[in-house]
Amino acid sequence: MKRKLDANDVPSTEANEAEEVKGADRDEDFETLNLDPRLRQALVKEKFSKPTPVQAKAIPLALEGKDILARAKTGSGKTAAYVLPILQTILQKKAIDPSMKATTGLILVPTRELAEQVQKVITTFAAFCGKDVRSVNLTQKVSDAVQKAMLADYPDIVVSTPARVIANLGTSALSLENLTHLVIDEADLVLSYGYEDDINALSKAIPRGVQTFLMSATLTAEVDTLKGLFCRSPVILKLEDKDDHGAGVSQFVVKCAEDEKFLLTYVIFKLQLIKGKVIIFVGDIDRSYRLKLFLEQFGIKSCILNSELPVNSRIHVVEEFNKGVYDIIIAADEQEVLGVSKSRKSKDATEGDDELLSDEDEETSAKAASTRTDKRRKLSSKEKDYGISRGIDFQNVACVLNFDLPTSSKSYTHRIGRTGRGGKTGMALSFVIPADKYGKHKPTSISSAKHDEAVLAKIIKRQAKLGHEVKPYHFDMTQVDAFRYRMSDALRAITRLAIQEARAREIRQELVKSEKLKRHFEENPEELRQLRHDGELRAARIQPHLKHIPEYLMPAKGKKGISNEDVGFVSLRKTGPENRIRKARDRNRGRGKKPGRKIDPLKTFNRGRK
């Protein structure tokens, strides 16, 4: 890859010549940032009172025209940190030349879900700008002809994955001649998601002198590569929040057998041991359906996120989860667990970044992926634009349940970052398979669990360096074992064929919801709100008795939590509205007959013939 040249045809300088900023002042407010009144009005509407640390530092520097490389985690407000300066610049140019039509902002993201998220932020902040600001999301599933028509009107901002940008540059549908701002969000993921060739081609198409924003949760070798390609002496922002790296997250680990993962999950949700919204991370797509079908046996509703589902369905699931419609999401983090991300040693020493990733940690991750061939290691187009443990902004998550432990401490940190955000507390619970229990229960076994103990050691070591403790959690197995026979009944019903049927059925259902009804839902948004993704798949044999817990199985402390003490009077016969059919029969009995005169029964006997 060639490094980008500056105005004097000299390669851009390294980090030691770049200005570096750490920390953030919290006395700033949006009034001091001199933003356009229309942008401030949008901020007030969205109840943005004070900028977050990354916004307070990045926005003034961006308005000065400096390149920025910012390390800030998901949920820190980094999207607004680059969207607001871009909108401010566009509005200033439109004030001078209202007829200006040119694509001046390009925002690159690794996944479709993140592209949709960024597009919504732009729409929110540009709500009072009228027709002065137009943006387009190129990751939408539309035909090339429709996409070409969208770009023909020269939108001010284009949000896309690198692959879609290159495709539209190749057809001349997209022009970057007037580009002034380039953003690469989740920069550390862009190259590891298989966009290296696209980024290399894009670096040659970007005009000289473009202001660049690189936003990343970590400063890795991938970010260093992008910095060399696109940045000119960037200001490096390393912002530490008080809740960074999971400071507000209580971390627990449970060592158990492979089938006991399902047993403990059943007990946790059926006895309501965890209150609030939960994200369950599993290792692959089959595991997600096995767990969903298992929970269905007990009447526990959940919805699935994986790369097979249509992007519109995935986005809708996240939106509804954030609104509180669903409490449990089962997320298939197959990219990470299967090792599809490229394993590269971090050049943190050159950045001075305390990333705390040891060589041993990289080796452990590499071992878990050693069975994969180089061909398999390359992302398919289906997996390429999907990611769940990074980028997507889940809100108000009470607990992250690592049903399958990730293969590296870095991935673990990203997963638990879904909870305990914005100063709130959260919990992370991880199931770990000891080496002597691995492979004992074939139907529920997963290959990545072979290295659980080694990965756990790295996780504990890394969290200790960050000042956090991973505590063991002990269930009272004498009480849990009482539920074991019910767990065994449920697991036996979930065969491999049932999982295949469930996968096929849900994909068919979601395709109908996503494609055929898209226009209908645009015209009828109320019906979209009623669309649910946590329905029963019914691929496995449902055993009705499993949905109810007999009183003799209930622990003494748990009875009050999930049952009402005063049941009230229950009559032998139904008296409520559900008995309307019987009442109607009683009312209608005798109707329709002709009213006759009263007959004396003693005078109705006919005398027989002699």
From Swiss-Prot:
E.C. number(s) listed in UniProt: 3.6.4.13
Region (Disordered): 1-30, 349-380, 569-610
Basic residues composition-biased segments: 582-596
Biased composition (Acidic residues): 351-363
InterPro entries given in the database record: DEAD/DEAH_box_helicase_dom, DEAD_box_RNA_helicase, Helicase_ATP-bd, Helicase_C-like, P-loop_NTPase, RNA_helicase_DEAD_Q_motif
GO cellular component: nucleolus
Span(s) of short sequence motif DEAD box: 185-188
Residue ranges of every copy of the Helicase ATP-binding domain listed in the record: 59-237
Domain of life: Eukaryota
Coiled coil (UniProt feature): none
Catalytic activity: ATP + H2O = ADP + phosphate + H(+)
Keyword set, alphabetical order: ATP-binding, Helicase, Hydrolase, Nucleotide-binding, Nucleus, Ribosome biogenesis, RNA-binding, rRNA processing
Gene3D superfamilies, alphabetized: P-loop containing nucleotide triphosphate hydrolases
GO terms, biological process: maturation of LSU-rRNA from tricistronic rRNA transcript (SSU-rRNA, 5.8S rRNA, LSU-rRNA)
Biological role: ATP-binding RNA helicase involved in the biogenesis of 60S ribosomal subunits and is required for the normal formation of 25S and 5.8S rRNAs.
Record remark on domains: The Q motif is unique to and characteristic of the DEAD box family of RNA helicases and controls ATP binding and hydrolysis.
Protein name: ATP-dependent RNA helicase dbp9
